[in-house]
A protein has these predicted regions:
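Conserved beta-strand segments that form the floor/walls of ligand-binding pockets within enzyme
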Residues: 7, 44, 63-65
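C-terminal structural segments of small proteins and small subunits
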Residues: 53-86
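Aromatic side chains
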Residues: 6, 29, 81-82
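Residues at or immediately flanking beta-strands
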Residues: 5, 33-35, 61-63
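Short amphipathic
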Residues: 1-10
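Compact, glycine-rich, soluble single-domain proteins
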Residues: 9-45, 49, 53-54
Length: 86
């Protein structure tokens, strides 16, 4: 398993538009299970509504974990997405 921590910098946090794009990005990696954890609650990043229910706001620290095929590459790609969009 590979993981990284990230502090959300988007002024409105993870809202509908970036959440939808994030889910779409994660769908490219069907061989991996990608989860996001905030405040002790974890969600599969293929589940848009579960992600939205976490209520991630600017300044929150989240942990993204990747398990499965080519963890290093998938983790790096998702981390780059976070840096560019969140």
């Amino acid at each position: 398993m590979k993981s990284f921590d990230y502090v959300i910098t988007d002024p409105v946090g993870i809202h509908a538009r970036p959440a939808g794009i994030l889910v779409k990005e994660v769908k490219n990696y069907r061989d991996s299970v990608v989860t996001l954890t905030r405040g002790g609650k974890s969600v599969n990043l293929l589940k848009l509504m579960a992600l939205m229910q976490l209520g991630v706001k600017q300044g929150d620290t989240v942990t993204v974990s990747v398990e499965g095929g080519d963890e290093e590459a998938v983790c790096a790609a998702i981390e780059n997405f976070f840096k560019a969009n969140l």
